[in-house]
Regions:
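Residues that define the transmembrane beta-barrel architecture of outer-membrane proteins
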Residues: 2-4, 59-63, 103-107, 167-171
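Conserved long hydrophobic alpha-helices within structured protein cores
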Residues: 15-21, 25, 99-111, 128-131, ...
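Outer-membrane beta-barrel domain signature
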Residues: 52-56, 96-100, 160-162
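C-terminal beta-signal and adjacent terminal beta-strands/loops
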Residues: 87-90, 114-179
């Protein structure tokens, strides 16, 4: 197995009030040789073995990117749109497109206000709306595949994905105190 790639980052103060920061990771994550063991219900308990070569490592997207737009309209107030893209990921090491988590893009909205006082050094009020567009996507899961002969005696492969959905639009408020 091997992993190789490159990561690029950009931070820019566009104006006094507007900042952009982003990054992208491009990678190749490969398994040179992989043996898939699959339950065979015709000879259960028994297994079939399928050999794979040069496949993608599971849960290792080839592309991950973020782009954040921060606006500072007045002193101590920050408003931001935070965007994250994650490329396609496989549930196992077979690189089978039917055993994958689709790529996704999510956008969050954040407001951050800071107050300075004599008693408390810093009071930070935060409000975040996660998944602003209510995108339906998965972030994790697993696959179960088995083989069994059909009514004609032909061996068939059956595969099921079990995916963990991400939260729909939700929010968080926070208060941080520094003494």
């Amino acid at each position: 197995s091997y992993r190789r790639g490159v990561e690029l980052e950009l931070n820019a103060n566009i104006t006094k009030y507007f900042t952009f920061n982003g990054n992208i990771t491009l990678s190749q994550n490969k398994v040179k040789n992989y043996s898939e063991f699959m339950d065979n219900y015709d000879i259960y308990p028994g297994q079939d073995t399928i050999k794979h070569s040069n496949t993608d490592i599971s849960f290792s997207p080839n592309v991950i990117a973020a782009a954040n737009f921060i606006f500072k309209p007045i002193k101590n107030l920050e408003v931001g749109f935070l965007n994250k893209y994650v490329g396609k990921q496989y549930l196992d090491n077979t690189s089978n497109g039917q055993r994958a988590i689709h790529d996704y893009l999510v956008c969050d909205f954040r407001v951050n206000y800071t107050i300075h006082t004599k008693l408390i050094k810093e009071i930070n009020l935060i409000a975040v709306i996660y998944n602003l567009s209510n995108t339906q996507y998965e972030t994790n899961g697993y696959n179960y595949t088995y083989s069994m002969s059909d009514s004609n005696g032909d061996k068939q492969m059956y595969s099921s994905n079990y995916l963990a959905p991400a939260a729909p639009t939700n929010f968080m408020v926070g208060l941080n105190l520094k003494f």
